[in-house]
Amino acid sequence: MPKSEIHPKWYPDAKVICNGEVVMTTGSTKPELHVDVWSGNHPFFTGTQKILDTEGRVDRFMKKYGMGSADSATSKETKESKKSDK
């Protein structure tokens, strides 16, 4: 039997609230949980995910440190390897 004065009060039907609307109930140590995002409005779960066209990590690194683009670096390496093969 747990000690009665050291454990927090358990609410088996705690309400999860998102944008002023009760979206689900769960067990918690608080009677209400206010959340900004839940699976019902998150883009990944709703299928409205936007795909952003961003630079790759290697391209950003090359650009940041002034090494040109990743394509030019790899093309230089292939040209040098072809010269050494001859």
UniProtKB/Swiss-Prot annotation:
Residues 65-86 are annotated as: Disordered. SUPFAM superfamilies: L28p-like (SSF143800). InterPro entries: Ribosomal_bL28/bL31-like_sf (IPR034704), Ribosomal_bL31 (IPR002150), Ribosomal_bL31_A (IPR027491), Ribosomal_bL31_sf (IPR042105). GO terms for biological process: translation. Pfam families: Ribosomal_L31. GO terms for cellular component: ribonucleoprotein complex; ribosome. Keywords: Ribonucleoprotein, Ribosomal protein, RNA-binding, rRNA-binding. Residues 74-86 have a biased composition (Basic and acidic residues). One of its GO terms (molecular function) is rRNA binding. The keyword RNA-binding applies. It comes from the Bacteria. Part of the 50S ribosomal subunit. Binds the 23S rRNA. Belongs to the bacterial ribosomal protein bL31 family. Type A subfamily. This is Large ribosomal subunit protein bL31. The gene is rpmE.
